[in-house]
Amino acid sequence: MRLDGKTALITGSARGIGRAFAEAYVREGARVAIADINLEAARATAAEIGPAACAIALDVTDQASIDRCVAELLDRWGSIDILVNNAALFDLAPIVEITRESYDRLFAINVSGTLFMMQAVARAMIAGGRGGKIINMASQAGRRGEALVGVYCATKAAVISLTQSAGLNLIRHGINVNAIAPGVVDGEHWDGVDAKFADYENLPRGEKKRQVGAAVPFGRMGRAEDLTGMAIFLATPEADYIVAQTYNVDGGNWMS
């Protein structure tokens, strides 16, 4: 098992991609903290995964919550070897309809949350003297703008840039910082996304999802499980020489 004895903190992991990562890490021998703003859901997920998982409340927009989360896990495990910054928020609107509230909320979760989670965990990793792995969740939306998701695109571009800067800054401490950039990933959130696109683009419900999947060279939308291999690899010693990179895992979407 490639992560035997390691401890991992995954934000926003009560469901979706974060949960898939947690399950994969446990299969590889790690202990995993299911950190989520929805503590009840986190507890349910941890119970389903088994004794190698624990649940912890975390609001990445609240510095006190971040500090409590890290301190609690250090008390429980003694170290945090892997951080996955997965918590994120998606929204869409034309430029002329973007609200200050939505803008601030997306940047608070997607950018500030990523930065200050990196900071808190990196401090613990440096103090522990063992280095570690930090994996940020970027997106293809961070590589190119899209008409109705301008703010989300900007937040994910910021995550890519932060990954580069943090990677260069922290490698001297033995901390590798890299990112994964998924393309379109299917999941329960897509029902709401599809409905919003339908309203803005005057499409029947389900049509945007069909269009998006058909445009992927692989032939379908991604699934959370498609990303787990990269998430495992970047957490292993095999990735020690990889620094400040963002990896596309998108079924060829970026090249299409």
Curated annotation (Swiss-Prot):
CDD domains registered for this protein in UniProt: SDH_SDR_c (cd05363)
InterPro entries, sorted: NAD(P)-bd_dom_sf, Sc_DH/Rdtase_CS, SDR_fam
Activity at various pH: Optimum pH is 11 for substrate oxidation and 6.0-7.2 for sugar reduction.
Active site residues according to the UniProt entry: 152
Record's note on what induces expression: Induced by growth on D-sorbitol.
Annotated Gene3D superfamilies: NAD(P)-binding Rossmann-like Domain
Reactions accelerated catalytically: keto-D-fructose + NADH + H(+) = D-sorbitol + NAD(+); galactitol + NAD(+) = keto-D-tagatose + NADH + H(+); L-iditol + NAD(+) = keto-L-sorbose + NADH + H(+)
Regulation of activity: Inhibited by DTT, N-bromosuccinimide and iodoacetic acid.
Function recorded in the entry: Catalyzes the oxidation of D-sorbitol (D-glucitol) to D-fructose. Can also catalyze the oxidation of galactitol to D-tagatose and the oxidation of L-iditol, with lower efficiency.
NCBIfam families for this protein: PRK07067.1, PRK07231.1
Subunit structure: Homodimer. May function as a tetramer in vivo.
The protein's name: Sorbitol dehydrogenase
Lineage, opening ranks: Bacteria, Pseudomonadati, Pseudomonadota, Alphaproteobacteria, Rhodobacterales
